[in-house]
Amino acid sequence: IWDDGRKLFKENIRMKGLIAKKVGMTQVFDESGNLIPVTVIRIDPNTVIATRTKERNGYDAVVLGIDDAKESRVTKAYKNQFAENIAPKRTLKEFRDFEKEVNVGDQIGMELFDGIRFLDVTSTSKGKGFQGVMKRWGFHGGRASHGSKFHREAGGTGQSTTPGHTFKNIKMPGRMGSKKVTIQNLQVVKTDADLKVIMVRGAVPGNKDCTLIVKSAVKK
C-alpha cells in the first residue's frame, strides 16, 4: 500500500524548474520598513534542448540549457545532442515531470514562476578545504586557560577498553563544503522582469555567478 501510494503521489505531482545564476546578496525594505536580506537570482531564457516521453524513454522530462558554447570547443558527440538550429550549451539540466508543455527550441523565462511565492534552490556549496571539528561540526573545543594543551582538538574517539576502536561516521576533521545543497521554501520577495531577476529571502549555496537549479517549492 505504501509503495503504491508513494508511486501514485509521484505520478500526480508536476514540477516547475529552470537553470539560473547567482548574482549575489543585498537587502531591501518591505512595506512596513523592515530590512530583509535577499539573494538576487538571474534567470536568463532557458532553451529546450530535448524532451523525454514515457512511450520513448519510460518517463516524462524536459532537458534545458543555458550559456552558448563555442562549437570549436565541444566534441562531436556532445554537439550531436543539439538540434541543427540550436547552439551547443555549456550547462544542461533534465527536469522530470515538467508542468509546462514545450517543444524543442522553445525559450522559457522567469515568467514560468509567475504567482509562485516559495522556491527550492539547489547548488554546490562553497569549498572550505580541510577543516577541524570546531569549524566543520561546531565542537566546543577545550579550555583556553593556562596550562591547557587541549584547545581545538576533537578529543578521544576510541572510547574505553571496550570497544577500543573508532566507529564509522564519527565526526572528525576533513574536507568541508563543495557538496550539493538544496535550500527549501525560500520566499520570493521581489521580481524584476526587465532585469530578469528574482530576489528570495535568505542565503543560497554557492559563490557569485555559480549555477543554480531553481524549482517551485515541493512542500508548499
PLM segments and residue spans:
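Extended basic (Lys/Arg/His-rich) segments that typically form rRNA-contacting surfaces
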Residues: 9-220
